[in-house]
Structures are given as C-alpha cells and as structure tokens.
Amino acid sequence: MKLIALCCLLLLGLLGFLAAPGVASPSRHTGPGNGSGSGAGSGNPFRSPSSQQRPLYYDAPIGKPSKTMYA
C-alpha cells in the first residue's frame, strides 16, 4: 500500500516539475514585438533582425505525371 502511494506521489511530482517551467516561460506569440513578425524582439531567438524568409525547396523536382497505362 505504501509502495503504491509512493509511486503516485513520485509520478505527480514529476508531472508538476515538468509542467511548471512551461507555465513560467513567456509565450512566443506575446511580447514586445507581437505585431512586427520579425526581428530580435518578436520572441524568436533564432531569427536575426536582417534575415528574410527563404523560399521553400522540395527534396525532388515535381515533373509531369508519367503516361503509364494501367489495365
């Protein structure tokens, strides 16, 4: 009985510890640069102020469909 209670307390403690930093961390969508969308103040630490978004490149070029005839 004590072992089950100890396991439950340990599990609740781990869940509380893992959930607590997420509550304290600031949201990406709120902050000083909410309307700008880019720059160092927008909450994105990986985007530099002078960088522009690059176009999306696919892994393989998309060509015309083959003319395979299925019976």
Swiss-Prot record:
Tissue specificity comment: Hemolymph (at protein level).
Listed GO CC annotations: extracellular region
Induction: By bacterial infection. Detected within 24 hours of infection.
Cleaved signal peptide residues: 1-24
Bias (Gly residues): 32-42
Species this protein is from: Drosophila melanogaster
Miscellaneous comment text of the record: Not induced after bacterial challenge in strains carrying a loss-of-function mutation for Toll. Constitutively expressed in Toll gain-of-function mutants.
Single GO BP term: defense response to other organism
Protein name: Immune-induced peptide 18
Annotated region described as Disordered, given as residue ranges: 26-71
Annotated keywords: Immunity, Innate immunity, Secreted, Signal
Residues excised as propeptide: 25-26
Domain of life: Eukaryota
Locations listed in the record: Secreted
